[in-house]
Swiss-Prot record:
Monomer. PANTHER family: NUCLEOTIDE KINASE. It comes from Wigglesworthia glossinidia brevipalpis. Pathway: Purine metabolism; AMP biosynthesis via salvage pathway; AMP from ADP: step 1/1. This is Adenylate kinase. GO terms for molecular function: adenylate kinase activity; ATP binding.
Length: 210
């Protein structure tokens, strides 16, 4: 089972991808995590801080290289890729079969609240939200050691740029996968992400388990 999760910043892609990864025993490939790990090797860090999209060809090559190192027949969950039409076409041109494309749709007015309240455990990679999904405990020690941190691109100054880029590209990607779905090449579904984590998970499971 090969699944793509796309959606705006704060729509819950990473959270849902991790839940699905555990449930279906599939590797979770996060485009964002891959790029953040690359920033020591190249100049990606500066672009991430500004909320700017990385060069299409560079991102595509990095993600495709990652996909080469896993069992494509067993499947995977690809989170946050493709973000542009070029990237979507690259998956198709490289003959990587996709079974499901799930788009988590979140209205722009909710994106700010979701993203600006997001914190991440630097050690485990677990994603929390100060309002909607707070960690069970936050000690002075954990704050001092900066175990709970904000992502570089979650700063308000970078967020608007990310939102603009997303909506500029999302229509093209949606149309691309609608066409693929009509041609029975995959299943493309839009899921309202303005719900709690468990409700969204159940919506996803209902689609996949049909």
């Amino acid at each position: 089972m090969r699944i793509i999760l796309i959606g705006s910043p704060g729509s819950g892609k990473g959270t849902q991808a991790k839940i699905m990864s555990k449930k279906y025993n599939l590797p979770h490939i996060s485009c964002g995590d891959i790029l953040r790990k690359q920033n020591k090797c190249c100049d990606i860090n500066k672009l991430i801080k500004k909320g700017e999209l990385i060069n299409d060809k560079l991102v595509t090559n990095i993600v495709l290289e990652k996909l080469k190192n896993i069992n494509l027949f067993k499947g995977f969950i690809l989170d946050g890729f493709p973000r542009t039409l070029y990237q979507a076409n690259s998956i198709k041109e490289n003959k990587i079969k996709i079974d499901y494309v799930l788009e988590l749709f979140l209205q722009e007015k909710y994106i700010y609240e979701r993203v600006l309240g997001r914190i991440i455990d630097k050690v485990s990679g677990e994603i929390y939200h100060l309002k909607f999904n707070p960690p069970k405990f936050i000690t002075e020690k954990s704050n001092k050691n900066k175990i709970l941190v904000r992502r570089l691109d979650d700063k308000k100054s970078a967020l608007q740029k990310r939102i603009n880029d997303f909506f500029k590209n999302s229509c093209l990607i949606s149309e691309f996968y609608k066409k693929e779905s009509l041609e029975k090449k995959l299943k493309y579904k839009i899921i309202n992400a303005d719900f709690d984590i468990n409700t969204i998970s159940n919506k996803i499971f209902n689609i996949i388990n049909v």
